[in-house]
Amino acid sequence: QSSTYRARFPVQLRGATAEFWNSKLCNFVGSGPDLHGAYGFRLRHHFGLDQLVRAYEALSHTPESRQVVLQMWDAGSDLPREDGTPSDPDIPCNVISMPKIRDGKLEWLQIIRSNDLFLGVPHNLVQFTCLQEIMAGWLGVECASYNQISDSLHLYNRDERDVFGSRPLSNVAPNTDSLALPREESEVTFGELERRIEWMITPELREEELERMFRWDAARQAYRNMLAVLVAEAARRRGWTDLETGAMSTCTNSAFKELWIRWVQRMEA
């Protein structure tokens, strides 16, 4: 398989799909269809094995194992050239994940070589705590602590105004959704979610087709909520206001609803 995937763990999204949701992606990972440092591809294909499945199998059989390390960094393709220049614009910032079971719960240590405080940290926290929750579901255990080590944590001058001008949210609604599912159900669910996401970005997609897409009775509510947000955003980008509102009205996650309101306000500002 090619490295065209810009993955979010069990779901793997092609470069074109990711750019639909983030039109500025090429500014950070370079132009072209291939995305060199795609995390999901690295975790599931790059090294010749599915690291997530191997981790699940190892921890299922030997819960006390301290040898499970998920690798995203590949020295052969990620080390700088001899003159110190980057080998590619999209070098993985996250280098390894270390899941381990302690006292019957799944702990997670994430190690990051370089971490943008504004545009990196929030996304990494969401990405890898989600993966921790998904893996815990596969293993049939609860989540324990999540710890993140950033070797080079930095803030760019261009982002200072946004960071220092921000204020903590008050009375934030908790996210009560759980992504934890048994492995087989999880793989089927993410496969269907991936199929729907790929369909959402097709240029010929009609409004009524997108409206049917967010009706997913077979899925758990947490995944229906996730899909509702994606459908709402796909509708917003196409100017289908009624569908955008209708999709979010089906979302039962109060945290998602609050964040959606803030997102729309930001986009309209």
Label each region the model flagged.
Residues 1-269:
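Terminal, non-catalytic protein-protein interaction segments that mediate quaternary/complex assembly
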